[in-house]
Structure formats: structure tokens, C-alpha cells
Design a protein with these regions (language model features):
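Short helix/loop capping segments that flank catalytic or ligand/cofactor-binding pockets
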Residues: 99-101, 118-120, 146
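Short active-site loop/helix that positions an aromatic residue
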Residues: 105, 114-130
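C-terminal catalytic or substrate-handling cores of phosphate/nucleotide-
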Residues: 65-76, 82, 132, 136-185
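Glycine- and acidic
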Residues: 96-106, 137, 151
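Helix-hairpin-helix/helix-loop-helix acidic hairpins
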Residues: 81-97
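N-terminal extension/subdomain marker
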Residues: 1-81, 99
Length: 185
């Protein structure tokens, strides 16, 4: 169960992330943006702030050998497909400003993508010379009162962490063999 009081835990006061190309972003209204964020810049933030970077993430890092192994395998052996295979991260913040290839964040936390963030941090192959990019939603917290801001923050954290896990039977049911069999019927 998610506790309401956890939605406004302390955040990282200020930080910067790098995006792939100058001014390459999609705005959603005036309160959100989607960018392609540098994995190395996320790794640097985690090195500086550790789990404080994930203070409002409801699940931090879920230790799962298979998923961690798959993320690490893509980073190390198929980095060009990382953007395609990874759901990315979601950041909530009091404010953000995009200027060229830099996004400045104020009072922010990664609320979804803790596992990805942790695996980027652990990866020795991600550095200033070897970087990759991943999708990132940046959402400005709305509300006039602390209660409204808390409620909004919690709603984003809940919604972005509520996906159902894929079971092996789900994968098998959609395998090419099963699809051909169903079409033949």
C-alpha cells in the first residue's frame, strides 16, 4: 500500500541533465516535457545524490536478477537499442528549464525508472566517452497548497508505477508460432 505521507518527501534541490540534441524536446502544455536524456547525466546525478534522487519513487530499485541482467545486457552488448527497449524515467519537479542541450531541474525526484537509474549507476561502460540516451518525462508539480502538490505528486508516482508485470505465459501466447496457429484455425 502506498502511503499518502510519502508523496512530498524531500527532493534534490537542483540538478542538470543533458539531452541528445539542442532544443530536442516535446512540450505538453506548459507543465511537462519529453526529452531524450543522457544516461551518463543520470548516472552522475545518482553518484552525487544516491537514493535521495529517488526519494519520491514508490519502489526505489526492485532487485530482480532477470530484469537487471536484461538491462545490463542491453547497456553492454546492444546500447543502440537501449532507447527502444527501455521505458525510460519520469521526473517530477517544482520547476524545469530547457536551454539548448541542458535541462535545469529544481526540487526534483525520479518517481519512475528507479531500476533503470540504478543499473545505469552500476554500469562501468557508461561514461563521458560512451553514453546512450533514454526517454524521460519531466512533469512540473501543480497545486496551490502543499496538500494539492502532495496529492498531485502521489498521483503521478502511483500512475507511473502501476503497470502489470508480463508473465511468461503472456509472452508464449503471442509468440509467432501461436499467432500462426490461431490464424490457421
Amino acid at each position: 500500500e502506498i502511503k499518502e505521507s510519502e508523496s512530498r518527501r524531500p527532493t534534490v534541490e537542483t540538478g542538470k541533465i543533458r539531452i541528445d540534441e539542442a532544443d530536442n524536446y516535446l512540450l505538453y502544455g506548459d507543465g511537462a516535457a519529453i526529452v531524450n536524456v543522457s544516461a551518463y547525466s543520470i548516472k552522475q546525478l545518482y553518484a552525487q545524490h544516491n537514493t535521495n534522487l529517488l526519494s519520491r519513487n514508490l519502489r526505489y530499485h526492485i532487485a530482480g536478477r532477470d530484469i537487471d541482467k536484461a538491462i545490463a545486457d542491453t547497456i553492454n552488448n546492444d546500447p543502440d537499442s537501449f532507447w527502444l527497449k527501455n521505458n525510460g524515467i519520469t521526473i517530477i519537479c517544482d520547476d524545469f528549464d530547457i536551454d539548448g542541450k541542458e535541462v535545469r531541474l529544481r526540487n526534483f525526484s525520479i518517481v519512475n525508472g528507479g531500476q533503470t537509474t540504478y543499473m545505469l549507476h552500476k554500469s562501468p561502460s557508461i561514461n563521458s566517452d560512451h553514453d546512450l540516451y533514454l526517454p524521460c518525462k519531466i512533469i512540473r508539480i501543480v497545486g496551490d497548497t502543499e496538500d494539492e502538490k502532495s496529492s498531485f505528486s502521489l498521483s503521478i508516482a502511483k500512475a507511473t508505477n502501476s503497470q502489470k508485470a508480463i508473465k511468461p505465459v503472456d509472452l508464449k501466447a503471442n509468440s509467432p508460432e501461436q499467432v500462426r496457429f490461431a490464424q490457421a484455425m
